[in-house]
């Protein structure tokens, strides 16, 4: 009798194990078959990297910056195409304004040397700490004007941030197009992928 109960118990356990395994496989299949958005797919591909921190050295057109971001230490190469900006208003600054000890955010190419520290072409160097009062560099991948014409929605080339820009942020918002480079000021972002925000101010560079 005891042997019969043991056999029955083992059979029941095996049945439950099989059923649980089948349910797990079914759930995995359902997850795998869910569509993956384009924004999520491109999270691993960064068109623009950034580091926020302090200038350690200035060597001709190369700024050595230590801080936080995609790289803790980076040598940013300033070219004729690099935007040198005041983070408070988006106005252009001279390279001489970027001195050792200044707080900056540098936006740079993912194409980097293998040296230590790595070197990369700087797209923009923004003077000021990385607070809400300091604008963020934004390369426009897509721009879509609302049907009622009251705002434009832009997504950056990293496809990590979608921003809504209206006439309060920029009076010529309707003229913003793909390929433009912007400075954006905003308070908060959603936790979605991509993140979303409403711009308080937008400057076309």
Placement of each model-derived feature along the sequence:
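Low-complexity "stalk/linker" and mucin-like segments enriched in Ser/Thr/Pro/Ala/Gly
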Residues: 83-86
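Hydrophobic h-region of N-terminal signal peptides that target proteins for export
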Residues: 14-20
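Short, flexible, surface-exposed loop segments at domain boundaries
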Residues: 2-9, 20-70, 88-157, 168-205
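A short macromolecule-binding patch
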Residues: 71-81, 159-167
